């Protein structure tokens, strides 16, 4: 019997959801989907230059699992660059350690702890503030899987 899937800890969400080649219409592009845990692995190992063991501890997974995760992420990145695909960062089974809120009116973004309940924009005072986790996990804006007979 396989081990149960371990939810991965993600410290920071990306600043944007997708990257695409310039001059190619989005409708003709294939997509390479990079899950949020794969993005976090790239951020920790390649951007912050952490050793695999330290990065694995931050994500709450074993070192061998982290190594497989980073290899899968690098393969997807290489595929997106070499084959001119749109790179979309979304989804995955994650435990977000902090969250980012964005004002729908003025576009102001702020980091917040998940327990903070302030839903007003500090810049314009608007109440139209959305949790970016919903944006990246597909719960609000992304692709949602439809099942037969259910919406």
Curated annotation (Swiss-Prot):
A family per Pfam: DUF134
Coiled-coil regions listed in the entry: none
Source domain of life: Bacteria
Classification via HAMAP family: UPF0251
Family: Belongs to the UPF0251 family.
Protein's name in the database: UPF0251 protein Ctha_0452
């Amino acid at each position: 019997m396989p081990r149960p899937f371990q939810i991965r800890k993600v410290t920071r969400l990306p600043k944007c959801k997708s990257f695409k080649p310039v001059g190619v219409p989005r409708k003709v592009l294939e997509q390479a989907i990079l899950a949020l845990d794969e993005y976090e692995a790239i951020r920790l190992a390649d951007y912050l230059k952490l050793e695999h063991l330290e990065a694995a501890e931050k994500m709450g997974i074993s070192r061998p699992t982290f190594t497989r995760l980073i290899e899968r992420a690098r393969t997807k990145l290489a595929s997106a660059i070499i084959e001119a695909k749109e790179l979309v960062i979304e989804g995955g089974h994650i435990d977000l350690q902090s969250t980012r809120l964005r004002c729908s009116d003025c576009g102001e973004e702020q980091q917040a702890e998940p327990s903070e309940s302030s839903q007003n924009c500090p810049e314009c005072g608007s109440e139209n503030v959305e949790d970016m986790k919903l944006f990246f996990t597909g719960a609000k804006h992304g692709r949602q899987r439809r099942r037969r007979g259910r919406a």
